[in-house]
Amino acid sequence: MKNALAGLVFFASTSLTFAADILVTPAWLVEHRGERNLVLLHVGVPAEFEREHIPGAIPVNPQDLAIPRAEGALILQLLPPDQLRQTLEGFGIGDDSHVVVYFSKDWVSPTTRVAFSLEAAGLGDRTSILDGGMPAWKAVGGAVIASTADPSSAIQRKPGKITAKPHPELVADLDFVKANLSAPGIAIVDARITKFFDGTDPGTMPRAGHIPGAHSLPFDTLVTDDNRMKSRDETTKILEAAGIKPGDTIVSYCHIGQQATVLYFAAKRLGYKALLYDGSWDEWSRKTELPVERNATRR
């Protein structure tokens, strides 16, 4: 496994230096919405987009940027770099684009999953997330429009051109996770809610529990009641309480590699080096030869 993208994360052995913030505010978007290179990606169910969206936005779903799922295959696996690039170019995204991703209602983790996909495509320094999504946008009087009234809906988008170097190394694979279960400086972190981590509820997965030695940090503890990312000070305390130390490389996972991207970006905002185990519990729980822990008891 290669190191994560140099230059986008900064960390030291005893303290953290904050990285550039991926979040933008509604006030920022009000000021910049008319810029030529701005691309808005709306994450939500199609009916919500049809009813209202920020003018000029393009509807997108995390599955649009994932391998089409065959029966029995893992859920929501990131597209190979060339296919991911071509898909994003089809949205009109190019090297000069500034992409702002937002959710329509409360889809925080699907939105961070889309943002992660852009980062893996090499566009991390040109990607932002609208903090609080469309509810926050509407709260400041931001304009919304129905698809039937949006003139941009009838305009065929010109494909973009992306030459940025992709970064598939931001995805940790199964072998990397197995090799680093007890490695110093590597924190395997489970972003699912507690009942799934403890193994009291298997959900839809073959086995219940968590990866041995993993830290528990439910993704929903990182966002406020109105679906904004918590402050850096609050997030620092949450990570410390979960047993994560400054300088650790965080490998986040969840059910299918979506909720874990909330943790991924929360950690990056603090300057941690972060990776996503894309296979997540969907993959680990299928491998009956791999150990699991339930309530700290290895099985």
Task: Kindly label every feature range from the protein language model.
Residues 1-4:
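Positively charged n-region of N-terminal signal peptides that target proteins for export
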Residues 12-14:
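N-terminal signal peptide c-region/cleavage motif recognized by signal peptidases
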Residues 68, 134-212, 291-299:
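Active-site neighborhoods of enzymes that stabilize oxyanions during catalysis
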Residues 78-172, 200, 259-275, 279-282:
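Thiolate-centered catalytic microenvironments shared by cysteine-dependent enzyme domains
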